[in-house]
């Protein structure tokens, strides 16, 4: 099965962005006392994912701590998704900060993969942002080649776009703002470290066996991988070989909802208007 040509929009450090904190401010999002995301400013001070909260604060005393809030991340990402859907429907939200779509129709309509990627980057960059760092945001201050680059630094949402064969390769392409030509995903993936699979136990085992890159893993016979590492290993092996069989599951945009009520004669009393509004609210809820 041929991997689906896929576009990915990636907004770096999204949990930090969703909290309304800019990239230069040293900040970290914490869950279960460990850093799950951090800003570029924090990385510059030695903070990284997986560190315990106390160790992160030891490396960067000025670190702003943000409590993990998946709901906030999802709500803040909606303007980005709406911007993507303004160009094409059937967008999959892989997770807040990362969405994907199959490019076959959109690329044909907008003049090819490269044109689509550039347009998407510019469109997302102009997405409106209602995000404001509020007291209840959870932030605690210390006092408390053949590939085309498509990068956009404008607007409120820093984002990068990548296109490749399959969702896995497209996500890695987005991290480099690249359009990988059709059929070249295996070569593109080969130099990446085995950690790119985001399967820590499998990656640790492979590294102990001397297999440190996706290319080295992809070179192993598929039957041997299945026998040694089981179905999970076989699935990871397909990804490393650029044979990502996962289809993009685009969400169906919700229908436009509206209700109306004609008052004849017009309401002259507040209680009459309030009763009509209550009736409309009930009808809207039923939809």
Locate predicted features:
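Structured, non-catalytic alpha/beta "coupling" segments that mediate domain-domain communication
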Residues: 82, 115, 119-125, 156-180, ...
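Short acidic, glycine/serine/threonine-rich loops at helix termini
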Residues: 20, 40-41, 113-114, 171-177, ...
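Short, conserved phosphate-binding/catalytic loop or strand-edge motifs used
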Residues: 96-101, 167-170, 201, 220, ...
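Short, low-complexity intrinsically disordered segments enriched in A/P/G/S/L with frequent Arg
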Residues: 128, 133, 145, 150-151, ...
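DNA-contacting surface of Y-family translesion DNA polymerases
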Residues: 8, 62-63, 203-287
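Amphipathic, charged-and-aliphatic alpha-helical interface segments
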Residues: 45, 184-219
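Residues that scaffold, gate, or flank divalent-cation-dependent active/transport sites
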Residues: 1-100, 105-107, 114-122, 163
